[in-house]
Amino acid sequence: MDKKEHIAIFTTASLPWLTGTAVNPLFRAAYLAKSGERDVTLVIPWLSLKDQRLVYPNNITFASPSEHEKYICQWLEERVGFTSGFSIQFYPGKFSRDKRSILAVGDISEIIPDKVADIAVLEEPEHLTWYHHGKRWKTKFRLVIGIIHTNYLEYVKREKNGVMQAFLLKYLNNWVVSIYCHKVIRLSAATQDYTGSIICNVHGVNPKFLEIGKKKREQQQKGEHAFTKGAYFIGKMIWSKGYKELLQLLKDHEKELSALEVDLFGSGEDSDEVQKAAEKLELAVRVHPARDHADALFHDYKLFLNPSTTDVVCTTTAEALAMGKIVVCANHPSNDFFKQFPNCWTYDDDDGFVKLTLKALAEQPAQPTDAQRHDLSWEAATKRFLKAADLDKPLERKLSRTTSNFLAASLNLQEKVDEASAYVHHVASGFEVSRRIFGAIPDSLQPDEELRKELGLTDASTK
């Protein structure tokens, strides 16, 4: 009997922080493990109590990794409806205030023992390897797959000296990803390009949204008014997440859109400014605190307006389509996957936005087919992932006779180049001074005593 594949999924965030790299890898782990054909381990950051208070909402904290794991499993099972068959491991992490993200501490590849190391999935591989100092990922794992979630270049461009920073970051990202990943999957063309990468949306939606959409379709089939509310937008309330573009569009076209009423839902650093900008409009634009998108409050809205172009693949757009709503969004690479759905309407300019918004207010959403609904599911996303990663067929371990000598020589040369490049990165990431120059958290080369104690780490614990 063949040994089961073991897939270790490493990611950069964890619940209760409801960010994409906390939620999507969690669902990926659950659905990869669901069939029982493979062993799956989700490896997530553990934060000290001080950092938990900075990151997690509603004053939620955990005294131990086991308590944190229990919370995650309960949250997941409430949404997928089945008991998850994967395991959870924690790596030491620290929260970077200036980057607003969690960075790994020490060599996190050690969390997976060498004897079971097989396939690694790095969710945000650039983020996970910027400061990696330890065993080379490609050496430890038979196959390393990087999934690109975020366009860091766009975020960096908004900072001081952003153009120069983005230029340097582009080459740093290309360098570390090529060193540490065999395959690279980009969620959309809205990310940085990587040599040999493929574009594939390997994310699905929370099953709750598909259930909501199913009920709405049943109402439509009975001739009932399934959607009794107008337009809304939901997202973290910062200008760069679509609020700037949306409020500008509404301001510039108040006369044409005089019949439009819009509800905005979100919380964030720019909440007060968004509120003030909305109050200046003649249109009825109401601002509300953040709510769960699956809340019954949203079920009856007919139109989701989303002009954001900073996302790689917008989760809320997928959720709105799953609920059977019309989505009016920008004609942008981040929305390419959604164009296949009849309720996704894309615009190229202001006139297109106005025309489609008025059209949506006057019409009812199309009833999605079962196949279209399935394409939004995590079952379909998991199949796309397995195919994109070449995990849907047995690994070819032997080269053909006609090409083996040539390919072996080429691969050997490439391996030597990679090893030399990885050695340079290993040396540079091993000095505190060079680490700080490139933005690492001070004293993050090894976990401190507090993190080691909380995680029960010893020098031999992961060998």
Curated annotation (Swiss-Prot):
Function statement: Involved in the synthesis of diacylglycerol galactolipids that are specifically found in thylakoid and in nodule peribacteroid membranes. Specific for alpha-glycosidic linkages.
Documented EC number(s): 2.4.1.241
Catalytic activity as recorded in UniProt: a 1,2-diacyl-3-O-(beta-D-galactosyl)-sn-glycerol + UDP-alpha-D-galactose = a 1,2-diacyl-3-O-[alpha-D-galactosyl-(1->6)-beta-D-galactosyl]-sn-glycerol + UDP + H(+)
Annotated InterPro entries: DGDG1/2, Glyco_trans_1
BP GO terms, sorted: galactolipid biosynthetic process; nodulation
Entry keyword set: Chloroplast, Glycosyltransferase, Membrane, Nodulation, Plastid, Plastid outer membrane, Signal, Transferase
Predominant cellular place of this UniProt entry's protein: plastid
Stated name of the protein: Digalactosyldiacylglycerol synthase 2, chloroplastic
GO terms for cellular component: chloroplast outer membrane
Record-linked Pfam families: Glycos_transf_1
Sequence similarity: Belongs to the glycosyltransferase group 1 family. Glycosyltransferase 4 subfamily.
Induction of expression: Up-regulated in leaves by phosphate deficiency.
Localization per Swiss-Prot or TrEMBL: Plastid, Chloroplast outer membrane; Plastid outer membrane
Tissue: Expressed in leaves, roots and nodules.
